[in-house]
Amino acid sequence: ISVHDLGILKDDEIKVNKFYKKNQNKFDIIISSGGSSFSSKDYISSFLSQNTELLFKYVRIQPGRPVIFSKLKFNYYFSLPGNPLAVFTNLFFLVSLFIDPSRKDNSSITKFYQSGFSENKKSNLTKFYRVKLSKNILYTHNSKGSAKLISLSEADGLAFVPEGNDKIKKGEKIRFIEF
């Protein structure tokens, strides 16, 4: 795999359109962060909607929304949220599985541990928690803001509770993926 940093793109419609047109056949995959919402000022999502085949444009994970995955001929585009933890979650669970399909899913690296916390969550989302593992119990980081990278750098891994569950009870077994 060869990786190229294409720099920071100004949030300008003309520059975004030129950038994507210039690079659309140069790379197998282009991954960007920021500009993936569908507001009038999100020029990346606008360009991808108009010029590529949208494979999906939302995921039901937190942190992680919104995400665009699209295709044009043999080129693929991932437009990830601007939030750093949402970018990490999507890179770990979506992009890496796309790049390395032999992994199929994360079940081979998933373990179950007891939750050291209780929390209500939206039942229509899979939620990821940055956690510390201590004596076989998972604890969330004190810093819960999704833009706070310290919680990721100090975490042992991600615990996740799938869609369909609206709460986590202390002592309940939950899934954990160690970094």
For each feature predicted by the language model, list its residue ranges.
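Helix-rich terminal scaffold detector
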Residues: I1-L80, P84-T89
